[in-house]
Design a protein with these regions (language model features):
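A detector of short terminal or domain-flanking linear segments
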Residues: 1-89, 96-127
């Protein structure tokens, strides 16, 4: 019987553009955040992303990328304009972030991380 073998893969010498380098750096995932988010806000974001994908706009390829972008914008000075709805149901959600964003997230006040993160998502969605 013949033994199956694999041929070695060829390594290509690829050069990255500045935009690709930023994207590679931004997607270097190091940590994970879990929190309880407003279900209605989450559904609005999901629906918007789905409609953008149907239109061919893949600026935010998935929900986690949107969350990372929102936290990154807040880290660089985005003003929080969104007011939380305390009576809306909550859903536990988690997403992965870069080491830089994890350091920033851990520096936020301990008792208000969930509130701040929800306001960050709402403010980023509304802009």
């Amino acid at each position: 019987m013949r033994k199956l073998t694999r041929s070695p893969k060829k390594k290509e010498n690829l050069s990255l553009t500045a935009q690709e380098l930023f994207k590679v750096k931004f997607t270097g995932i190091q940590g994970k955040i879990t929190f309880r988010c407003d279900t209605f806000l989450l559904e609005k974001i999901k629906n918007t992303l789905a409609s953008q994908h149907l239109a061919g706009n893949y600026q935010y390829p998935n929900l986690s990328y949107f969350f990372r972008s929102a936290l990154h914008a807040y880290q660089h000075g985005m003003i929080l304009t969104y007011q939380r709805e305390f009576n809306n149901p909550r859903k536990e959600i988690s997403f992965r972030i870069t080491e830089d964003l994890m350091t920033f997230y851990n520096a936020l006040p301990m008792n208000s991380k969930t509130e701040i993160l929800e306001r960050v998502l709402g403010s980023y969605y509304e802009r």
